Design a protein with these regions (language model features):
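Conserved catalytic cysteine-centered active-site region
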Residues: 3-9, 59-150
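Short, well-ordered amphipathic alpha-helical segments that serve as non-catalytic structural scaffolds
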Residues: 28-43, 69
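Generic secretory/membrane-interface signal
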Residues: 1-2, 42-44
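Acidic helix-start/capping segments at beta-turn-to-alpha-helix junctions
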Residues: 52-57
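Short acidic capping loops at alpha-helix termini that bridge into adjacent secondary structure
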Residues: 45-51
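A short alpha-helix capping/helix-coil boundary motif
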Residues: 13-15, 49, 78-80
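Condensing-enzyme catalytic core mediating Claisen C-C bond formation in acyl metabolism
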Residues: 1-28, 37, 137-138
Length: 150
């Protein structure tokens, strides 16, 4: 008999941060707000989250298109995960959902936090908008080593 993994999974919680065109919080802080809301809405605790997924992963180019990745959010929430996926290899925004379904079906994890961060409007209002890092400015986060190659 054919087994359909998507029928054995469910979206149990949803969270959303404040939305603005000039955010007073960082992209990571907004993502943390939404993640905590989703975890609470699902009736879970941070300790019960054992997977994390996003698309397309963290981009350190200053555009705000995808400013937060799995590693940054995992660290901010102090999550201990067995599985994560946060790359642009998936076929679009729903790629993170399908990756999570596969991970749950494979028994790699049970409760996956899926998120998508966008900060484009705020990024356009900053000195970083649509530019590479200027001399003297520091890049932070897990992709700091890649900044010279963007």
């Amino acid at each position: 008999m054919t087994r359909h993994a998507e029928k054995d999974t469910a979206i149990t919680g949803i969270g959303m941060s404040d939305v603005s065109r000039g955010a007073s919080k960082s992209a990571l802080a907004l993502t943390v707000d939404a993640a905590l809301e989703a975890i609470a809405d699902a009736g879970l605790t941070r300790a019960e989250i054992d997977g994390i997924a996003t698309w397309p992963g963290e981009r350190a180019d200053g555009s705000g298109f995808s400013p937060v990745g799995c590693a940054s959010l995992q660290d901010a929430l102090r999550l201990k995960v067995n599985w994560y996926a946060g790359g642009g290899e998936a076929p679009g925004q729903y790629g993170a959902v399908f990756n999570a379904i596969g991970a749950i079906a494979a028994g790699l994890c049970r409760n996956v936090l899926i998120f998508r961060s966008m900060y484009e409007a705020t990024a356009r209002k900053t000195a970083f908008a649509n530019s590479l890092l200027r001399p003297g400015e520091r890049q932070a986060g897990p992709f700091a080593w890649y900044a010279p190659y963007y």
